Amino acid sequence: MADEQTVDTQNPEANQAPEASGDDLATRVQVLEEQLAAAQDQSLRVAADLQNVRRRAEQDVEKAHKFALEKFAGDLLPIVDSLERGLELSSPDDESIRPMREGIELTLKMFHDTLTRYQLVAVSPQEGEPFNAVEHQAMAMQESADLEPNSILKVFQKGYQLNGRLLRPAMVVVSKAPAPVSPSIDEKA
C-alpha cells in the first residue's frame, strides 16, 4: 500500500518546507527590527504632533478668553470719555449741579474700577512726554519753542490697552520745531 501522508489542516505552517536557513532568519529579524524602529519613530512623531495641536488649541482658547471683551470694551470707551468730558466741562463750584457732578464722579469711578478688573488700562500721556507711535496717534502738529520736537503738547483723548494689547491709541497734538524766522525786507537793507 502506498504511504499515506497526513496533512495537518489546523496548522498550515507545519505543511511548509523545512525551516529557512540561519542567514534568512537573520535577514528577516533585521527587516522586522527596522520596521519596528520605523513604527516607533512614527508613533513618537504622531504623539508630538498631537501634543502640539493640543497646545495650540489651548493657546487659542486662552487668547479667545483674554480678548473676548475687546469689542465690548471698545464700545464702552466712548461712554467713559463722555462722562470724563462732562466732569471737565462742569464747574465744581456750581452748587446747582453738585449732586449731578457727584453722581457722574461715582459712575465714572465704578467704570474705572470695572475696566481695571478686566485688565483694561488707560494710556494717558502727559504733556512733554515723547511721542510714541505705538501708543499715540498724532492728530495735529504744532510749533513749540518750549518743548522738544516730537513731544506731546496736548491730549485730545486717552487711549486704552486690553491685556497689554492696544485697544485704542491716545489722540494727541505733537510739537515740532519752530520755523526759522526769515529776515524781513527792512532787515535786509
Swiss-Prot record:
TM ranges: none
UniProt-listed InterPro entries: GrpE, GrpE_coiled_coil, GrpE_head
Region span, Disordered: 1-24
Principal subcellular localization: cytoplasm
Gene Ontology molecular-function annotations: adenyl-nucleotide exchange factor activity; protein homodimerization activity; protein-folding chaperone binding; unfolded protein binding
UniProtKB keywords: Chaperone, Cytoplasm, Stress response
SUPFAM superfamilies per UniProt: Coiled-coil domain of nucleotide exchange factor GrpE (SSF58014), Head domain of nucleotide exchange factor GrpE (SSF51064)
Any one annotated GO CC term: cytosol
Signal peptide positions (record): none
A Pfam family: GrpE
UniProt GO BP: protein folding
Compartments (UniProt record): Cytoplasm
Protein family according to the UniProt entry: Belongs to the GrpE family.
Role: Participates actively in the response to hyperosmotic and heat shock by preventing the aggregation of stress-denatured proteins, in association with DnaK and GrpE. It is the nucleotide exchange factor for DnaK and may function as a thermosensor. Unfolded proteins bind initially to DnaJ; upon interaction with the DnaJ-bound protein, DnaK hydrolyzes its bound ATP, resulting in the formation of a stable complex. GrpE releases ADP from DnaK; ATP binding to DnaK triggers the release of the substrate protein, thus completing the reaction cycle.
Oligomeric and partner information: Homodimer.
HAMAP family: GrpE (MF_01151)
Protein name: Protein GrpE
The organism's taxonomic lineage, starting at the top: Bacteria, Pseudomonadati, Pseudomonadota, Gammaproteobacteria, Pseudomonadales
Gene that produces this protein: grpE
